[in-house]
Amino acid sequence: MDFKKEYDTIVIGAGPSGVKAALKCSKKGQKVLIIDSNQNSGGQIYRAPPKSYVKKNNKSLEENLIQIKFSEHLKKNNIDTAYNHTVWQVSPGFKINTFNEEGVIEWSAKNLIVATGTYEKIIPFEGWTTPG
C-alpha cells in the first residue's frame, strides 16, 4: 500500500476508541491515518476470547463481523490504515516511527491521538481471589 507520510491526525490504536476518534476526525475533513500492531481493527477485546466462551455463545462470528464493520467504516471515510505496524518512537512535532516486516516508516501529523487501550495484568497476592 502506498501511504502518504503526512496527515492531519494520526491515531495509534485501532480498537473501538481509536476507530471512533479516527471517524470523528475524518468527518471534520481531516486526513487521518490509524496505526495498529494487529492485523486488523478491533483492539484487545477481539484478540482471543476463551475457547469455552466461543463454544457456548458462538461469539467469534459476531466479533469477526464487528471487525469487518470497523474496517468498512474506516475505508468508507477515507481513513488510511497501517496494520501490522509497531510504533517504536514518537518525536517532538508528532513524528511517529513504526516498523514492520518491510522496515521502518516515519510519519508526521499535526495532531496525535493515543488510543492504545489496556488489558488486565494480574498480580497475585495473598487473598486476591477473596471477594471484598
Q: PLM ranges: what are they?
A:
Residues 1-12, 66-132:
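FAD-binding core/adjacent interface of flavoenzyme oxidoreductases
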Residues 7-69:
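Beta1-alpha1 glycine-rich phosphate/pyrophosphate-binding loop at the start
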